[in-house]
């Protein structure tokens, strides 16, 4: 229109998604989740969180990953069951205060970076309703210099591969365990080969949560 300039305004006051709680510190009740930042899908910008809430959810179905496509967990949210408040959204996860009763589960020791080894490990995640199950992976590379892609792994568990095709969206934050200790959390999937994923060190998340 000649010399007339037009501008557009994009406004969004809330965002909802499915991810996995990585840890709760039983002493401070600080939690960490996702292992990466929340991005606004239309702008690809990191979301600046003023207030946020984690709710109970219930996995209803899985869209399987395949080469060139990252699948997803599909969930029903129970907005009347609040578990905690999100305080910050960072490049290494979301963090906040867990305000519900901490589940009576066995606590895990935290592994240092030096304790993590190439070889077999497990991830814990939910694929059906609210049932946490453990699945086999193989760690094939450890990079202490990377910001978030510290642990490279391949899913070897047949049941998990049959159900998901590999790493799916919503699996971010799933704890990674080795030799009875928590070592990290799932962060990313390789789109060209969804059986391969990345995780970051749990010590990075714990340090960020305490800031």
Describe the role of every protein-language-model region.
Residues 1-211:
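C-terminal recognition in membrane/secretory proteostasis and scaffolding
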């Amino acid at each position: 229109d000649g010399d007339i300039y037009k501008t557009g305004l994009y406004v969004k006051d809330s965002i909802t998604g499915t991810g996995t709680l990585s840890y709760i510190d039983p002493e401070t009740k600080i939690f960490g989740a996702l292992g990466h930042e929340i991005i606004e899908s239309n702008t690809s910008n990191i979301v600046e969180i003023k207030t946020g809430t984690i709710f109970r959810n219930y996995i209803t179905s899985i869209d399987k990953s395949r080469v060139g496509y990252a699948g997803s967990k599909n969930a029903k949210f129970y907005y009347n069951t609040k578990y905690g408040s999100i305080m910050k959204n960072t490049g290494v996860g979301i963090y906040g205060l867990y305000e519900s009763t901490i589940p009576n589960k066995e606590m895990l020791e935290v592994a240092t970076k030096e304790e993590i080894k190439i070889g077999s490990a497990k991830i814990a995640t939910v694929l059906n309703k609210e049932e946490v199950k453990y699945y086999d992976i193989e760690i094939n590379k450890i990079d202490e210099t990377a910001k978030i892609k510290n642990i490279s792994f391949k899913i070897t568990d047949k049941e998990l591969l049959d159900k998901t095709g590999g790493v799916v969206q919503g699996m971010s934050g799933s704890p990674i365990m080795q030799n009875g200790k928590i070592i990290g959390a799932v962060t990313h999937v390789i789109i060209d080969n969804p059986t391969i994923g990345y995780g970051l060190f749990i010590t990075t998340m714990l340090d960020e949560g305490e800031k």
